[in-house]
């Protein structure tokens, strides 16, 4: 009987530990993937090319109004073209088919745990552009990784359920290098844009 209790206790402890990962001091590590992943169909059809771009905080330098809307609120693509100065784009990465599949797999799965909450700020520096076989932009997803917020084309509206930390990791994996990860980086970006005349305050 004594051996039976020891065996049952061991099985119970092992099965409980199997369900979560712990760090060195035994505190559970929260993963970005939830237990119940909901997978959806991607709404854009006819995608020929997927492009990742990065730029300095668009809110600091984008002064172009579009249809009377201020840069913060305007549509970022109209008539299949960007409505902001595309010369400010610092990096462009065209995804291969394998990378496209990995990106779309992240986008179609509602994987983010509820504790990743958006902040009041919005300092976008990254965007996904979806193009058709005529190289026209048919959809976009712009986001601010540090503020946990995004702006999307209407055909992707409400589709963002992935964790920004996961998307950030994917951008880095695919070759995007421009990230502002702390206040020092932010200050350097601001001073650089000011020195180039993009900021007047």
Predicted regions and their residues:
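C-terminal motif of bacterial Sec signal peptides marking the signal peptidase cleavage site
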Residues: 12-15
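Positively charged n-region of N-terminal signal peptides that target proteins for export
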Residues: 1-4, 17-18
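Function-determining sites in protein domains
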Residues: 17-201
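Hydrophobic alpha-helical targeting segments used for export or membrane insertion
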Residues: 5-10
């Amino acid at each position: 009987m004594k051996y039976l209790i020891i065996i049952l206790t061991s099985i119970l402890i092992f099965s409980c530990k199997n369900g979560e990962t712990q760090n060195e001091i035994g505190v559970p590590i929260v993963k970005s993937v939830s237990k119940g992943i909901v997978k959806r169909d991607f709404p854009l059809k006819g995608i020929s090319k997927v492009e990742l771009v990065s730029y300095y905080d668009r809110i600091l330098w984008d002064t172009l109004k579009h249809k009377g809307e201020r840069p913060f609120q305007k549509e970022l693509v109209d008539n299949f073209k960007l409505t902001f100065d595309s010369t400010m784009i610092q990096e462009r990465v065209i995804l291969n088919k394998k990378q496209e599949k990995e990106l779309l797999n992240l986008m179609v799965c509602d994987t983010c745990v509820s504790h990743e909450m958006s902040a009041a700020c919005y300092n976008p520096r990254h965007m996904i552009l979806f193009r058709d076989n005529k190289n026209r932009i048919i959809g976009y997803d712009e986001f601010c990784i540090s503020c946990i917020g995004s702006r999307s084309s209407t055909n992707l509206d409400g589709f963002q359920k992935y964790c920004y930390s996961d998307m950030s990791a994917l951008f880095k994996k695919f070759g995007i290098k421009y990230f502002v990860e702390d206040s020092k980086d932010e200050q350097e970006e601001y001073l650089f844009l000011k020195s180039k005349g993009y900021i007047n305050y």
